[in-house]
Amino acid sequence: MPATPPMPGYDAVAVPVLDSTLGNTDIMTRISLTFPTQLSLALLQDSWYELVRAWPILAARVRHTPSTPSGLSFLIPQPDKVKELEQRSRTSHKDQEKHIVIVDASSRSIASFHPITAKAIQSSLSRDTVSVGAAPDNADSLKMTCSNATTSLKQLLRADQAYITAHATVWSDATTIALAFSHIAGDAFSVKAIFEAWRQTIESAAPAPLQGVGVDPFITYLPPHGKNSKSEDTDKQGERDVGLPLGFFQYGFIDKVRLAWNLISDIKIKRPEKKFGQYYMYMPEEKVQALMAQARADVDALVSASDDSEKQALDTRISTFNVLLAWLLQNIHAANPKRKRMSTVMTIVNAKTRPPARHDPSDYPPHQLWGGALGVPLEPLASGDYASLPLGQLALHIRTSLTAQIDPANMQANIVTLLRHTRWAKPSGKLIFFARPNHYLSGCTEWRSTRFGELDFGAAASPPSSVKPVAIGTDMEIAVSKRNRWVIFGDMGGGVWFSGFMTDHEATHRDGFGRYQHVQ
């Protein structure tokens, strides 16, 4: 791909190297929040433009620049260009030329768009069990949450459109706001920071300009010459190459063939793509507490059955996340036909909160618009064990696996491996994979720690009041299948939201999600 010629009115800043790895460049994402009342479209629109004037990187274009380590640059508009883009956005009749699209759908109830969200708006979801509902119609969802967004990196690199766009839709009984973005924008903490800045702008004034734009938090981990790309060798009082992180394998030819066959047979024969849909689950707080009590009882029983030496070595701490993920994995695996087949689950850890070895705190920029999320595998289990082990025992398995993964040396190995093999500008061509080729595969992102449910946009209500979201939505554009991908959104509207992609058979399996209340 040829380099992009200079664009007048923009300042080029390199995309950070970790954000330019293929797991980020290949994904275009959107996140929506739904509030249980009408908010002012005018206030939402004007405050968005005010925020962009304070943080012009939100209006950045992305272009190919071979001179940067990542191969990509943000082209950040200068003040006069920001004004020009705002004027175009406000007056254009083309959604692709608008930085924020506002939709007055006040003639429609949100129930016509997403029934399970409508139940949340009405506070009528069950307090006794989990509720399950299908995602909105895809065409309607695009129209109502991201009609101005680019849908691929290829399009983004050519389009005169920002890599982050906003959307606001008012229904007769609710308001949905959304951000659509290339995943090079960062992680869930990055998106939360933008929503929070938008909220702050409505309530009082735009935040101060971002400091440290252009600082690359992981450039020192870039092989082969980055000062942190090697690990300390205490035996030889020197340095050595960083190996693969826990649970990752470098595939040879035979493994590649086996993996390709397993994926193709699943996609083309066993579970064709047309059978998949996106589903949402809402777990009320009462159910969360019941699961926590059940898991603690399971752990107590495990301790009681252990001998004295095992008891001393057994760390029985489990978190709410451990239990929620254990519950989700039990239900996901219930429909798997081969119970003895091993299963590997990838989940997320974050270098923002779990820094890698050799990390210097001054390397991290003071703003949040960069990513630190890393995908790591849990220790494999047989599919039948995931489906049938006691909840607390499975939660312990998750916690133990993640404890090993967040070791600083392993975090360093994750970052160095990603930069060595999957950088968009220079992939190695080697296949580094998180599971054996014959395993069941699934992945789950965790967003609970970002606390999206605390965002209060009540300053845009009439009269102003406290208005927090009661439902959250997401989707993504990706070149490969979305199957087996899940997210634990976190607490909102008096419960915890989940979403993922599965077949109708899996969504209604009698030993899995079929046990719960399905919302039509």
Curated annotation (Swiss-Prot):
**The keyword tRNA-binding appears for this protein:** no
Q: Which residues form the active site?
A: 183 (proton acceptor), 456 (proton acceptor)
Q: Which family does it belong to?
A: Belongs to the plant acyltransferase family.
Show the disulfide pairing. Answer: none
EC number assigned by the record: 2.3.1.-
What induces it, per record?
A: Expression is induced when cells are grown in cultures containing vegetable oil as the carbon source.
Q: Does the keyword Acyltransferase apply?
A: yes
State which residue ranges cross the membrane.
none
Which InterPro entries does the annotation name? CAT-like_dom_sf (IPR023213)
Q: Name it.
A: Acetyltransferase MAT1
* Principal EC category: transferase
Task: Quote the biotech use from the record.
Answer: MELs not only have high potential as eco-friendly biosurfactants due to their excellent surface activity, but also have attracted considerable recent interest because of thei runique properties, including self-assembly, anti-tumor and cell differentiation induction activities, and moisturizing and hair-repairing properties.
Keyword line:
Acyltransferase, Transferase
Task: Output one GO MF annotation.
Answer: acyltransferase activity
Q: Which organism is it from?
A: Pseudozyma antarctica (strain T-34) (Yeast)
Question: Pathway involvement?
Answer: Secondary metabolite biosynthesis
Q: What does this protein do?
A: Acyl-CoA-dependent acyltransferase; part of the gene cluster that mediates the biosynthesis of mannosylerythritol lipids (MELs), surface-active substances that enhance the availability of water-insoluble substrates.
